[in-house]
């Protein structure tokens, strides 16, 4: 009897266990493909289907993102550098599935729903608090008049019926902002550059600016702040160099 129990506890080679694991994963993927096929959706590649451990990894990454956000906000810092301009230009440079929902909400609130989009904003304490919370995903600074003009002329658009429309016709601008004496693209540029009385109305009219993906070596894919050799955070007037390379 003891011999039979001993036989039941025979050692299972590691390679056999790995094959079982791979077989189970393949069965899971095939099940997902079958579910997608039955629902009438377009079939996905095997590589596109998430395995159970992928969901665990994504969940943990989101939790880490939230913890680090709280640490950035609570961390005592020296006095921040003085604000050099009333105008800030913000570029989203990172972030896909590894961010906490709160981070995503802040980025959406800033109209930065996609990587390599940029927006103008008025420099306020509230804005810088938001930027601190999403610091690993954005870089920002103070655009000069040339950068503002180049961005609006090359990338400026408004959203009409859900679609971006380039600002190639002054009539579009006049119809939307004529009551504020903004009659064309030059008036629009001036209102943004000096953060005029109707800056808020202009920002509601202006859609997010879709920038070009930077070439190699422009960004280092590092989440450290710019002042420490990374990509993120406040570049101050150095933002103009990045704008020229992405516009």
Curated annotation (Swiss-Prot):
Keyword tags = Ribonucleoprotein, Ribosomal protein
Q: Which Gene3D superfamilies match?
A: Ribosomal protein L30, ferredoxin-like fold domain (3.30.1390.20)
Record-linked Pfam families: Ribosomal_L30, Ribosomal_L30_N
Output the GO biological process annotations, alphabetical, semicolon-separated: maturation of LSU-rRNA from tricistronic rRNA transcript (SSU-rRNA, 5.8S rRNA, LSU-rRNA)
Name the CDD domains on file.
Ribosomal_L7_archeal_euk
Q: Where are the transmembrane segments?
A: none
Report the GO terms under cellular component: cytosolic large ribosomal subunit; nucleolus
Q: From the Swiss-Prot or TrEMBL record, what is one GO molecular function term?
A: structural constituent of ribosome
Q: What InterPro entries does the entry give? A: Ribo_uL30_ferredoxin-like_sf (IPR036919), Ribosomal_uL30 (IPR039699), Ribosomal_uL30_euk (IPR005998), Ribosomal_uL30_euk_arc (IPR035808), Ribosomal_uL30_ferredoxin-like (IPR016082), Ribosomal_uL30_N_euk (IPR012988)
| Similarity comment | Belongs to the universal ribosomal protein uL30 family.
Protein name (Swiss-Prot/TrEMBL):
Large ribosomal subunit protein uL30z
State the organism named in the record.
Arabidopsis thaliana (Mouse-ear cress)
